[in-house]
Design a protein with these regions (language model features):
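Bacterial N-terminal signal peptides
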Residues: 10-21
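Noncatalytic carbohydrate-binding groove/subsite architecture in carbohydrate-active enzymes
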Residues: 171-295, 305
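Carbohydrate-binding surface patches
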Residues: 364-401, 408-411
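Short, acidic/polar
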Residues: 50-64, 137-145, 207-218, 292-299
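Aromatic-lined substrate-binding rim segments of carbohydrate-active enzymes
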Residues: 57-65, 70-126, 137-144, 148, ...
């Protein structure tokens, strides 16, 4: 126990104090730890029941066109039980039937306290953001949902309790909610997978030192066969500070922390960028083109890290019930029409094919300091290099005389040929080089 606590403190320190010097040594020519099958690795967040059936059927059709199968469904307890034992489930029932018809692998999470169950003091605002007075009531409602919707095999307990838990975050209390709910679900439905709440960012807290996921590990998370989840949002695909490459540093440290302490599955259950046009709310304004660019670069990076599954936020834009920023995260607009990010992702998945195997990168000359590259082998034997560099220099590949360079943002496909090795002009956006070894 003492050794584990020392390990936890040392990894937490690495997460907190990733310096420019340390980050500059981080490898940016990456090799994934295992093959990736997009249909199993990449999912999307959805809120089908908050849309008209004709719209969410179109959303599902668009998702099917991408060849993806995993969805993460939001369920707000105050919405489905506005009064004690008075349930409003008709919209959710219909959405769940559509999910069943499409054979989606589904992760559902319930968040927020119903009015009758909230621990909020009288007159408090944001009553749903207070934890329930009785954790067993929350657990019983999740069991009831899991029994009502047997097509859902994965259940997640709350959402972002490191920032959405009034009056302040409480790691011990969330740990009790998780344990109470997991025990109730396993007693009733032992085959279901239990997932921790997706922690905002890397699970750091507003006013409590440390990381909530670390607190759960101290409480035995690694022995409970529970999936760990967090939401690595950042300003840029490479992190909040591009020179520090802090996404790679922090995600690797957190994944290593979790895996080395007994957690077998680590899921990023939200990540992405909004295309909103203001007013500015934490994320800077990047528009629809920036959203497409950032999403592809982050997807390339995440595919090469030790995540077992990731869920992009979000399949669709949201209506005025969400904040201005949160309205714009979708692959699709409110009418289920593709945004540029959807088209770019579809191009990306078409280029890569359904399954990739990690391989060694090709030999190159004069690698720039800001290069990011991930090497893969496609099912047809072709090799792919996902690559970008803000400096926009050129790379020469001495052993490759014929190749194709794909730009998934534009859909362009340009042949390259040279007798002494091709030269590729790098861009700050993702390109994919394809060649036959």
């Amino acid at each position: 126990m003492a050794h584990r606590s020392t390990l936890l403190r040392s990894v937490a320190a690495a997460l907190i104090s990733a310096t420019l010097a340390a980050a500059s040594q981080a490898a940016t020519v990456l090799k994934a730890p295992r093959p990736v099958v997009w249909q199993d690795f990449l999912g999307v967040n959805v809120q089908f029941q908050y849309f008209a059936p004709d719209i969410y059927q179109q959303q599902m059709a668009r998702l099917d066109e991408l060849g993806l199968n995993w969805v993460r469904l939001t369920i707000h307890w105050p919405v489905i039980e506005p009064q004690k034992d008075k349930f409003a489930l008709s919209e959710l029932d219909a959405a769940m039937e559509a999910i069943k018809a499409h054979h989606y692998n589904t992760l559902a999470y319930m968040v927020g306290s119903a009015p009758f169950a909230s621990s909020a003091p009288p007159g408090a605002t944001g009553r749903d953001q207070y934890p329930p007075k009785d954790f067993s009531t929350f657990a019983a409602r999740m069991v009831s949902l899991a029994q009502r919707y047997p097509q859902v095999n994965n259940w997640q307990v709350w959402n972002e309790p490191n920032i959405v838990w009034l009056p302040k975050e409480d790691p011990a209390a969330y740990g009790r909610l998780l344990t109470t709910t997991a025990q109730a679900l396993r007693t009733a439905l032992p085959e279901k997978t239990i997932v921790t709440a997706g922690m905002a960012y890397y699970s750091q807290m507003h006013s409590t030192p440390g990381y909530l996921l670390q607190s759960l590990l101290d409480g035995g998370l690694g022995t409970q066969n529970i999936v760990a989840a967090y939401h690595p949002y950042s300003e840029y695909p490479e992190g909040d500070s591009v020179p520090d490459r802090d996404f790679l540093v922090r995600a690797n440290a957190m994944n290593n922390l979790l895996h080395s302490n007994g957690v077998s599955q680590v899921w990023a259950t939200e990540w992405g960028w909004s295309s909103y046009d203001g007013p500015v709310e934490m994320q800077r304004l990047i528009g629809t083109s920036g959203q497409a660019d950032y999403t592809l670069r982050r997807l390339a990076l995440m595919s090469a890290l030790d995540f077992q599954r990731i869920f992009l936020f979000n399949l669709s834009d949201l209506d005025e019930r969400a904040s201005a920023r949160d309205q714009g995260y979708g692959l699709l607009d409110l009418q289920a029409s593709p945004k540029p990010v959807y088209t770019a992702l579809k191009n990306f998945l078409t280029i890569t094919g359904p399954r990739l195997t990690p391989t060694d990168p090709p030999a190159v000359s004069q690698v720039p300091d800001d290069l990011y590259a991930v090497a893969w082998s496609r099912e047809d034997g072709k090799h792919l290099l996902m690559v970008w560099s803000a400096s926009g220099v050129s790379l020469t590949f001495p052993a490759i005389n014929d190749a194709i360079v794909h730009d998934p943002l534009t859909g362009s496909r340009i042949p390259l040929s040279a007798t002494k090795g091709i030269t590729l002009a790098l861009k700050p956006t993702l390109q994919i080089l394809e060649w036959k070894p």
